[in-house]
Amino acid sequence: MFKFNEEKGQLKCSFCGKTQDQVRKLVAGPGVYICDECIELCTEIVEEELGTDEEVEIEEIPKPNEICSILDDYVIGQREAKKSLSVAVYNHYKRINSMSRSEDVELSKSNITLIGPTGSGKTLLAQTLARILNVPFAIADATSLTEAGYVGEDVENILLKLIQAADYDVEKAEKGIIYIDEIDKVARKSENPSITRDVSGEGVQQALLKILEGTTASVPPQGGRKHPHQEFIQIDTTNVLFICGGAFDGIEQIIKRRLGKKVIGFGTDDAKQDDLKPGEYLSKVLPEDLLRFGLIPEFIGRLPIISSLSPLDTDALVEILTKPKNALVKQYQKLLELDDVELEFTEDALREIANKAIERKTGARGLRSIIEGIMLDVMFDLPSREDAVKCIIHGACVTDDAPPILKSADGTELTLDKPKESA
């Protein structure tokens, strides 16, 4: 097993064959030896390979219009939000790749705030971005966070979710995206600082500051404080992109008051402000509005890009039902297709479903529960029936709970509750 020089009986390198007299150091392994020269050569080869991968990664960043185009496949509407997100994400990863070179100008990080009503697509936009860029992605809920030392989740647990999403590859996690949902719930109760401790509001904002800006954080691999002796994972958040989203209920009133102050007086165009629809005020949001809402100035400063999403109208919800690659109608059609049944939704049925979602104020998120209620009896009965080959969902199915129209192979109409008896 051991490599000896036949003449002198000396140990020699198992790779290059040089004896221990010909090299500075010989490292022993189980039955093999490697010299310092071979170690240096192997290190250079590995570094060259890693350098090649990094160059490929730089070339693979999609352009903003390409990112926006892919977002269009999954998210309906919200054009301005898509544009601002595409540019921000492109610049963020361009900045990361430029940091490997020695540059005179240092580019700062641009975290993003998404403001929009529930079900408008905030989370879906962030998820789709992570899928496009093929980077680790984690979703955190701000409502469960508390200041360190209090019952609840520490802010470091957000980073643990990202590390887990990267399969504990810290280097990969350091280039990931974190979406913090319900960020409006950590707003302090009033615009003015309070003398009482606000551990789940302003305290959380203070705790998030360094992570948002970029710091080396110590993350407990098992989470929480139950294992005080565990070794901590060190992660640098300088290149982690943070997207904070929330409904910010009540901020429209703050924006209205600010706009109202500017139009008081003679010769002002009051009608111009009155033309704005309820959801359109969000597009006028400024950092000062977030300050009045209850976010602290330091927190707002670390989220420089503010993008608003408008409430979805009936037409947009109908498009969401039918157009995206993972549209709900396509999903249910596929489910029934597996039972050899063709599913059809009439135009009036789609509009009634959309109107019901608007009435419930659940946005796109509420569409599935509405369709599930309509389709329950259909999906219960159809698998056991051999006579029905087509199912038509019409408007009355949504508004009056009427049964859908079933058709046989020869075009005969069937009833859902009374299966046709076979001869």
Swiss-Prot record:
Residues spanning the signal sequence: none
Residue intervals of the ClpX-type ZB domain: 1-54
Listed name of the protein: ATP-dependent Clp protease ATP-binding subunit ClpX
GO cellular component, one term: HslUV protease complex
Binding site for ATP: P117, T118, G119, S120, G121, K122, T123, L124
Pfam families reported in the protein's UniProt record: AAA_2, ClpB_D2-small, zf-C4_ClpX
Recorded family membership: Belongs to the ClpX chaperone family.
Xref: NCBIfam families: clpX, PRK05342.1
Molecular function (Gene Ontology), one example: unfolded protein binding
A biological process term (GO) from this entry: proteolysis involved in protein catabolic process
